[in-house]
Amino acid sequence: MKLCEDLKEHSLGGLEGKEYYGEYLAKTDKMGADVQNPVSHVAYGYATQLCALNEDGTVKKMAAAHALGKAVNPLSVEGQIEGGVVMGMGFALTERFPLEEGMPKAKFGTLGLFKADKVPKLQSIIVEKPGIEEAYGAIGIGEITSIPTAPAIAGAYYRWNGKFQTQLPLEGTPYKK
């Protein structure tokens, strides 16, 4: 664990620019195995995203890399990634869904869904890795497509304005509901 060793001697800031490589392989029991406590998770998807801003603070580009086993239908996978990124952009930049005691206090038309004319250049990167036998080698590419988006955007704005934010939608951006 090279990262663990380096963290003993350096701060995170001191490790900026260094790269660390690793692999995670989940051991599971075969479907239908006669095991007392079977590990039944078939597969995990992994993802990372990058947000680049223009000088005025608008999003210039989103790059999204998703590891998904075998892309059975690559065009459909790209569409799923793009849709999830745009959904995540709405969460991060424009959508507000107030609740009061668990009950919605907004109507659909007032949520502030992200508008198509504001969508920046999107780069979908499909990372295929063989090895899983189930489902022709495919791993799910559903909700994971929207999960890294808001943190990537928040990180870009932190570099842009120095303001660390932990609530969505982010404040101090050029985007309005």
Describe each PLM feature range.
Residues M1-K177:
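C-terminal catalytic domains of large/alpha subunits in multi-subunit enzymes
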